[in-house]
Amino acid sequence: MAKQARAVQTWRSIVDAAASVFDDYGYERAAISEILRRAKVTKGALYFHFASKEAIAQAIMDEQTSTVEFEQEGSPLQSLVDGGQQFAFALRHNSMARAGTRLSIEGVFLGGPHPWGDWIDATARMLELGQERGEVFPQIDPMVSAKIIVASFTGIQLVSEADSGRADLRGQVAEMWRHILPSIAHPGVIAHIKPEGRVDLAAQAREKAEREEQEARIAAEAKGAGSDAATDSGSRSGGSGLRGGGSGRGPRAGGAGDEGDEEPAGAGVAAGGVVA
């Protein structure tokens, strides 16, 4: 259990550090050495979890698509507005959201699925739900409108970044909705939509930070419990720490590929177990 908690904590450290590096430098200029420095992990630990820089970037992209969740209950259009405002807030305060957006704009994954596809599909589904519930005009094409909405948001956040470091992004997103809503929704519905969003995003962010802090504390406690158990076991066996070939290092819990290795599995070790 302690080893598993450590692995999760290491994975999290690598992804968070990589997000800040990609946010600062973009994909091409991001260096593995800088990710290692910010994550405070070894090269072996990084390659235990990720085969390449692209794999790390993909993990960030996957996290970005989970940043916003659209509520299925209530007004589909208000849920779309709230989701957009939630992501605008994340772009201001969350390096993971900024890194994922920058990677998408840079077109890092041109060989795979388009990075905007999940956003467009999710938006189209909410517009379809809006049609079913009588909020959205029946004659509009949800997919076409979804592409316009996602493209508009993308352009607005780029301009906001250049103008104010995204300080005015939420206000600009509200203006975007004031322009788009009349073309897709009934006037009676628009009167009840709040373009600024209806969620206290600051309170929501505080709650999320508290949850993450609690999870990190639990993981650290589990790691400490595992270390205590290992110490007790070593004391009962004589405490020499010399096993196998008597190297003084002892076998790693996960074998040659354990995340604590200084290099990827097998690197630096010659035949017979002698360090090269």
Curated annotation (Swiss-Prot):
Outcome, altering G155A: Loss of both DNA-binding and A-factor-binding activities
Biased composition, class Basic and acidic residues, residue ranges: 207-220
Record's subcellular location: Cytoplasm
Effect on the protein upon substituting V41A: Loss of DNA-binding activity
Outcome recorded upon mutating D168A: Loss of both DNA-binding and A-factor-binding activities
Compositionally biased residues, Gly residues: 236-257
GO terms, molecular function: DNA-binding transcription factor activity; transcription cis-regulatory region binding
Low complexity: compositionally biased ranges: 221-235
Residue ranges of domain HTH tetR-type in the record: 8-68
Annotated effect of mutating P187A: No loss of DNA-binding or A-factor-binding activities
Effect of E135A: Loss of both DNA-binding and A-Factor-binding activities
Pfam families tied to this protein: TetR_C_45 (PF21935), TetR_N (PF00440)
Chief location category: cytoplasm
A GO biological process held by the record: streptomycin biosynthetic process
GO cellular component, one term: cytoplasm
NAD in keyword set: no
Region (Disordered): 207-276
PANTHER family: HTH-TYPE TRANSCRIPTIONAL REGULATOR BETI (PTHR30055:SF234), HTH-TYPE TRANSCRIPTIONAL REGULATOR RUTR (PTHR30055)
Assembly with partners or alone: Homodimer or multimer. Binds to both DNA and A-factor as a homodimer.
Domain text: Binds DNA through its N-terminal H-T-H motif and binds A-factor via its C-terminal region.
Name of the protein in question: A-factor receptor protein
